[in-house]
């Protein structure tokens, strides 16, 4: 996607959506059907579960469980 950055050893599962200007550091996993809002930054080694939604500009420092909506 436009200006998205996906670093080494990341796993993006089926039907996950990475919006423009997202940044995934190394060894990040994004689960099925998850949606990372525009400008989301994910720190190294984070696991984002299935069917997760993050708000625009989110900073993800901790793992996110399945079926979660993360607001800023």
Listing of model-derived features with the role each one plays in the protein:
Residues 2, 11-15, 19-72:
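Glycine-rich hexapeptide-repeat left-handed beta-helix
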Residues 5:
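Short alpha-helical catalytic segment bearing the HExxH-like zincin motif
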């Amino acid at each position: 996607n436009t200006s998205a950055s996906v670093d080494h050893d990341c796993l993006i599962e089926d039907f996950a959506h990475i919006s423009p200007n997202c940044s995934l550091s190394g060894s990040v996993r994004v689960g099925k059907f998850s949606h990372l809002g525009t400008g989301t930054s994910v720190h190294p080694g984070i696991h984002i579960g299935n069917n997760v939604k993050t708000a625009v500009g989110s900073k993800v420092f901790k793992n996110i469980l399945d079926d979660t909506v993360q607001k800023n």
